[in-house]
Every structure is written in structure tokens, then in C-alpha cells.
A protein has these predicted regions:
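Surface-exposed polar/charged interaction patches
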Residues: 21-25, 57, 87
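Short, amphipathic alpha-helical interaction segments positioned at domain boundaries
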Residues: 72-91
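Minor-groove-contacting beta-hairpin "wing" of winged helix-turn-helix DNA-binding domains
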Residues: 66-71
Length: 91
């Protein structure tokens, strides 16, 4: 596996983990509230290169103590979200 393939795989894993953790933390699925997921919960270091790439792709934003999934992804299904990430990585 090349370095680029490893990075791509890691990026997808982090994106999906962020998506799942966000869904679990939301108290009300119809709520517009997007929780902050800590670096520890996401299991990444501050300013991890994959996280910065996801930020550049518009998937997340940084907060003082972690990251937040962008609002437009909060109501997507898991399959829709995975497809979005896949398409963005191919661009």
C-alpha cells in the first residue's frame, strides 16, 4: 500500500468516526446542535494532517477543544456521507 493510499484510508476512517460520534452525541436527531468531538474521542493528535485535509474539504471545522462536523452532513445517512467523502477524494 502506498503512502497516498494509507493517507486516503486513514482520512476516510477519521471522517466516518467523526460522523458516527457526532450522531451518537446528538441528543435530538432533529436538533440543529452539532457537538464538539474531542481530539481524544476522535483518537487523533491536534492538527493531524488527515484532519486538516478534511477541514480543507469542508467536512469539519476546528473548535477550541476538538472538531465539529459541518452542519450540512448532520442529517445525511451513513451511506450518503461515505459516498460524499469518496467523491471528494477522487477530485
Amino acid at each position: 500500500m502506498t503512502q497516498e493510499q494509507k493517507h486516503d484510508h486513514r482520512l476516510k476512517n477519521i471522517a466516518l468516526r467523526l460522523f458516527v460520534l457526532t450522531r451518537k452525541k446528538r441528543s435530538d436527531i432533529t436538533s440543529r446542535y452539532i457537538p464538539t468531538i474531542s481530539w481524544h474521542e476522535l483518537n487523533v493528535q491536534f492538527q493531524d494532517i488527515a484532519v486538516m485535509d478534511l477541514r480543507q474539504m469542508g467536512v469539519l471545522r476546528l473548535s477550541g477543544d476538538g472538531v465539529m462536523l459541518e452542519q450540512r452532513f448532520a442529517d445525511m445517512s451513513t451511506n450518503e456521507f461515505q459516498e460524499y467523502i469518496k467523491e471528494r477524494r477522487q477530485q
